[in-house]
Every structure is written in C-alpha cells, then in structure tokens.
C-alpha cells in the first residue's frame, strides 16, 4: 500500500519495501513454527540408533512443502533485493531499500536451514550431509550480511546511505543468532557434544553486539540525524537476537 499509494515519497518507498521484507521473514518464521509442532519427537529420534523413519513425524510431502515454502520466500526476497539495487541510479532510497532487503533475504535463507533441520530430525532422516551443510549455510549468510554492511559503511563514507551498513551488520548478527539453533541441533543429533551448553551463549553475544552498536549510534545521533533510525533498528535487532 505504501509503495503503490505514495510512490513519489522516498520515505514511504523505503518503508514499504522493508515492511514487505519483514513480512517475508514472518512467513518463514511461521513455517519454522509449523515445523516445530512435533519437536517433541526429536529427542526420541536422536536417542534411536537406527535411521528408520519415524511414522509419527511428518510425511515426505509435508517436509518438502515446509522447506519449499521457506525456499520460495527466500527467493522472492533475493529477487526483490536485486530489482531494487538495479534501480539505485534512480535514487539513493532504492539503494537503501535494496540493501536492507538483501539483509532480510539472508535471514530468510538462514531460516531454510532451521526449518530443514527440524523437519528432517522429526522424520529421523537427518544425515551427515545435513549436519555439515545447514550450519555452514547460516554462517555464510551471516558473514555475507555483516561484510556487506562493512563495505557499505566504508565505501559510502560521507553519504547518508552509509548508515544502512550498520543495519546490515545487525541483520548479519541475527543470522548468527539463528545459527546457534541450527548448530545445536546438528551437534547433539545422535551424539554427545561437550560444548552444547555453551552454544546458547551465541544469541546473548550477538544481542550484546547489537546493543553496543546501537549505543554507539545513539551517541553519533547527537551530531548527525542520519544515525537516528539505525540506532533504534539495532535495538530491535538486539531484542530479536535474544529470541
């Protein structure tokens, strides 16, 4: 509505695209929540030495639909980000919206790993390739978003749009927070892991980093209003990291 109804206002254009991106994340999270409805089967499956499919778990079709939906939402987010970035020459607001959408796409992609890990462990079909690849996917997405943010900050120094880089760094930290769930599921699946109790510290550390960046930006906001929005966004992202 904001994008179509206020096409001449750059603020509404940016806000509209960002809200739409958050909607895609909400759709991915709802898929993750749906896949967790039978989470209680995971401990029993993990204790089971065999790889026999648990009949109480999801069907193959349900598993594929859950993973497929998250993949679809992620592809939409990436395509959306690419289209916006391709229009950067039309105005800085397209660059800002496209960059943030790219960060949101990284989170959507990270949630694919979470949904796939949960769904497969519920069916007892989680294998060694899953144990290796899903955590890597989330860590790669977090690294991409974080480095993307650093590049924006350094490459656009002196430009108001460079403050978007701090938001990208925060979105990258959210990906790292998600990685804690995926890594924990992978590390304790059918094996013991001595540092399992330490993994939950990852969300705490990422949240503290977000809040530290937010505090820094609040100070900068006293000299430059361009830091007003990213400072508050990082506080919200810090809260998300705790979840």
Model-predicted segments: where are they?
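Alpha-solenoid ARM/HEAT helical repeat scaffolds used for protein-protein interactions
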Residues: 90-91
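Non-transmembrane, juxtamembrane loop and terminal tail segments
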Residues: 40-53, 125-129
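Alpha-helical transmembrane segments and immediately adjacent membrane-interfacial amphipathic helices
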Residues: 1-5, 14-40, 61-86, 96-121, ...
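Membrane-interface helix-boundary motifs at transmembrane edges
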Residues: 126-129, 189-195
């Amino acid at each position: 509505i904001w994008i179509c109804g206020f096409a001449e206002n750059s603020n509404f254009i940016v806000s509209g695209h960002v809200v739409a991106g958050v909607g895609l994340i909400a759709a991915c999270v709802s898929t993750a929540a749906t896949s967790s409805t039978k989470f209680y089967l995971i401990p029993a499956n993990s204790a089971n030495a065999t790889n026999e499919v648990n009949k109480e778990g999801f069907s193959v079709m349900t598993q594929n639909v859950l993973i497929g939906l998250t993949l679809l939402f992620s592809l939409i987010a990436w395509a959306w980000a690419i289209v916006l970035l391709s229009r950067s020459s039309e105005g800085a607001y397209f660059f800002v919206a496209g960059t943030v959408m790219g960060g949101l796409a990284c989170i959507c992609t990270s949630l694919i790993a979470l949904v796939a890990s949960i769904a497969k462990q519920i069916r007892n079909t989680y294998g060694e390739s899953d144990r290796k690849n899903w955590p890597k996917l989330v860590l790669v997405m977090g690294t991409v978003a974080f480095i993307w943010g650093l590049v924006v900050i350094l490459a656009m120094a002196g430009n108001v749009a460079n403050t978007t880089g701090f938001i990208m760094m925060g979105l990258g930290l959210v990906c790292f927070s998600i990685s804690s769930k995926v890594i924990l599921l992978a590390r304790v699946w059918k094996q013991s892991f001595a540092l399992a109790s330490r993994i939950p510290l990852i969300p705490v550390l990422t949240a503290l980093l977000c809040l530290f960046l937010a505090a820094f930006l609040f100070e900068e906001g006293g000299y430059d209003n361009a830091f007003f929005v990213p400072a508050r966004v990082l506080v919200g992202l810090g809260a998300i990291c705790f979840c």
